[in-house]
Amino acid sequence: MATTAQKIKEVEDEMAKTQKNKATAKHLGMLKAKLAKLKRELITPTGGGGGGGLGFDVARTGIGTVGFIGFPSVGKSTLMTQLTGTRSEAAAYEFTTLTTVPGVLQYNGAKIQILDLPGIIEGAKDGRGRGKQVITVARTCNLIFIVLDVLKPMSHKRIIEEELEGFGIRLNKEPPNIVFKKKERGGINITNTVPLTHIDLDEIRAVCSEYRVNSADIAFRCDATIDDLIDVLEGNRVYIPALYVLNKIDSISIEELDLIDRIPNAVPICGNRGWNIDELKETMWDYLNLVRVYTRPRGLEPDYSEPVILRTGHSTVEDFCNNIHSSIKSQFKHAYVWGKSVPYPGMRVGLSHVLLDEDVVTIVKK
């Protein structure tokens, strides 16, 4: 009986030899859906073991987690030491790091957990090496550093992207704005608020058929692709920001550096020499979307020594109160805010007010 990996190979081979045109679009849609279902079997943990595997998953600390992903010996361990002071064994041979090595970076008043993950190899998503355990941990991170050696082929970048995508990780993307609601009867009802230029009704119905969805309301609020629809139907995708950390720039020319500096979402560094580490930290902070909020007791000056750290999208005054202590919300009367989120200093606000980075807040209790 064919294994899941063999079935995946068969579907991929059939897709590769199928010419893409209007006549084959429906068939390709069904093949993509079938492929996604097979890959789900690799993503979903099988019974018995569970977890990320011995030495892979670690207890979480801090307000956010950054995971290092890359091929062996690209400089992840050296970068870990530069950022956190945690010494992850580093050497000039491959597979130095065999387990997840955690460290903590203190930055802008926040504790950020850094995970140096073992190097992955091509085919990780299909179970080769320790790839499955490594990528399982990466799925839980708030930000991924894809560490690349600039002396190695830049094709490594695409290989790693494909490994992560094959495991349900979507890099630097927002979830597609597709509303899917399954129902008991009535057939497939499709609506769209924008023109659909990448997908047609037959493809949509073919994909639904592959998932045995006979009745559903599907509302497209973006110009989606067939892959976007499959991601929504699968329901197990994670959308994680990623930075491409281009290491060992001390070994290339200025002209070569100028070329790689054009790569989107990239920061060139030299881990051994500590070059550009400060810019990497600043960019990391921006990508984590963290919000620092300072407390100001009534009648006193603001306390800038220890900010309350919130996340963009979860930074209301109510979130601020809950972060300090769960009892504050029940005693809350109103708050005064100074900073970018208000039109004038000391504005009186309620629980639903959204705070911005470096706001100052005074809570008034009943």
Swiss-Prot record:
Pfam families: MMR_HSR1, MMR_HSR1_Xtn, TGS. Residues 289-365 form the TGS domain. GO terms for biological process: cytoplasmic translation. GO terms for molecular function: GTP binding; GTPase activity. GTP binds at residues 70-77, 116-120, 247-250. Signal peptide: none annotated. InterPro entries: Beta-grasp_dom_sf, DRG, G_OBG, GTP-bd, GTP-binding_2, GTP1-OBG_CS, P-loop_NTPase, Small_GTP-bd. It comes from Schizosaccharomyces pombe (strain 972 / ATCC 24843) (Fission yeast). This is Uncharacterized GTP-binding protein C9.07c. It comes from the Eukaryota. The keyword GTP-binding applies. Belongs to the TRAFAC class OBG-HflX-like GTPase superfamily. OBG GTPase family. One of its GO terms (cellular component) is cytoplasm. PROSITE patterns: G_OBG (PS51710), GTP1_OBG (PS00905), TGS (PS51880). Residues 64-289 form the OBG-type G domain.
